[in-house]
């Protein structure tokens, strides 16, 4: 679209990113109330875990889910005006976003239909994630930058590892892990989307640096040709996420649902793959990693000892059970997420 207009100003990444962000945010504010009302009329309410915190059963009844629809609608409409639709990285990201959102939508729909928190068959769900991640990572491997199969390590200037074709299963692991960890973290009002905003904001900075030859050379990071459109995409995602947080902040008027969490996690995971920030992403998304580990530890230990390490998993519910209010958990986790992001960004200079 910006090429057709032929305006010099629209060739600047910073300008397009800024207005993609603003457009997506304003669209969310305008259409948010309408979408929330529509979801309520369709009775698409959040189905709560019966084994979750007891107070959630009374506080969160009747809140519509599938809020990911609001985010992605705003992102895509905004991008229509500001992005080069034929950029290969955008096409890959678009496939990831739509495919994982559809998988999450099916999961949400089945939960509502069955009126319990059991959605898609876990086997079917993981098969779907494997299929979509395999397609997208294979596309990246064959059509991506010359650095595509190389893993770069934070803190070390010249330490890197070329995985060759093994990068495909490695990338699939990153994508599926990111998708599921974001999904696990989406348990409190504003928690997952707030942390996603922190991660997205950091990736905007990394994408901008990687898209510039001068900055990439100075920081000794790969220069990714075409990454400038990722900056615009992430800007739109940032705006849509801020707009969603407007309605998802405590007390929430809408929940993200698997429609949003599975897809946003996968999208940010794919962005990390494109930007050659796979290891850095583990630091950047540190809260999500810890949340996932808490579930794994809880399940493994209980299976072998019948004892629980945490009062409840994921970790945010453990702190609720310790007496923290929902807002205390959310804001403190945001602060920790911001610290992880600062550490991750600082490694770019440490190299």
Swiss-Prot record:
Pathway membership, UniProt: Cell wall biogenesis; peptidoglycan biosynthesis
Keyword Cell division: yes
Cofactor(s) needed by this chain: Mg(2+)
Protein location: Cell inner membrane
Classification via Pfam families: Glycos_transf_4
Catalytic activity: UDP-N-acetyl-alpha-D-muramoyl-L-alanyl-gamma-D-glutamyl-meso-2,6-diaminopimeloyl-D-alanyl-D-alanine + di-trans,octa-cis-undecaprenyl phosphate = di-trans,octa-cis-undecaprenyl diphospho-N-acetyl-alpha-D-muramoyl-L-alanyl-D-glutamyl-meso-2,6-diaminopimeloyl-D-alanyl-D-alanine + UMP
Biological processes, Gene Ontology terms: cell division; cell wall organization; peptidoglycan biosynthetic process; regulation of cell shape
Keyword Magnesium: yes
Transmembrane segments: 17-37, 63-83, 85-105, 124-144, 158-178, 190-210, 230-250, 254-274, 279-299, 328-348
GO MF entry, a single one: phospho-N-acetylmuramoyl-pentapeptide-transferase activity
Gene Ontology cellular-component terms listed: plasma membrane
Cross-referenced HAMAP family: MraY
Name of the molecule in the record: Phospho-N-acetylmuramoyl-pentapeptide-transferase
Source organism of the structure: Borrelia turicatae (strain 91E135)
Name of the gene this protein is made from: mraY
């Amino acid at each position: 679209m910006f090429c057709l207009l032929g305006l010099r100003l629209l060739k600047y990444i910073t300008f397009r990113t800024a207005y993609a962000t603003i457009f997506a945010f304003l669209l969310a504010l305008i259409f948010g109330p309408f979408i929330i009302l529509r979801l309520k009329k369709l009775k698409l309410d959040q189905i709560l875990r019966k084994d979750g915190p007891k107070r959630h059963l009374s506080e969160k009844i009747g809140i519509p889910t599938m809020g990911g629809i609001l985010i992605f609608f705003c992102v895509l409409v905004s991008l229509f005006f500001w992005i080069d639709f034929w950029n290969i990285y955008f096409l890959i990201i678009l496939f990831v976003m739509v495919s994982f959102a559809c998988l999450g939508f099916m999961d949400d729909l089945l939960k509502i239909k069955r009126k319990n928190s059991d959605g898609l068959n876990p086997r079917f769900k993981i098969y779907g994630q494997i299929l979509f991640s395999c397609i997208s990572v294979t596309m990246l491997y064959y059509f991506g930058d010359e650095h595509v199969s190389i893993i770069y390590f934070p803190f070390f200037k010249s330490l890197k590892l070329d995985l060759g074709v093994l990068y495909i299963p490695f990338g699939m692991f990153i994508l599926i892990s990111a998708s599921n960890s974001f999904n696990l973290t989406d348990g409190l009002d504003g928690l997952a989307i707030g942390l996603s905003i922190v991660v997205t904001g950091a990736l905007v900075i990394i994408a901008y640096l990687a898209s510039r030859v001068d900055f990439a050379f100075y920081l000794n990071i790969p220069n990714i040709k075409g990454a400038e459109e990722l900056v615009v995409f992430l800007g739109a995602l940032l705006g849509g996420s801020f707009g969603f947080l407007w309605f998802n902040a405590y007390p929430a008027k809408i929940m993200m649902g698997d429609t949003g969490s599975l897809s946003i996690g996968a999208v940010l995971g794919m962005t990390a793959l494109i930007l050659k920030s796979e290891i850095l992403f583990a630091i950047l998304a540190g809260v999500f990693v810890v949340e996932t580990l808490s579930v794994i530890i809880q399940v493994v230990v209980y299976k072998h000892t019948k004892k629980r390490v945490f009062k409840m998993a994921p970790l945010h519910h453990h702190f609720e059970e310790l007496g923290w209010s929902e807002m205390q958990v959310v804001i403190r986790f945001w602060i920790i997420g911001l610290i992880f992001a600062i550490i991750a960004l600082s490694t770019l200079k440490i190299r």
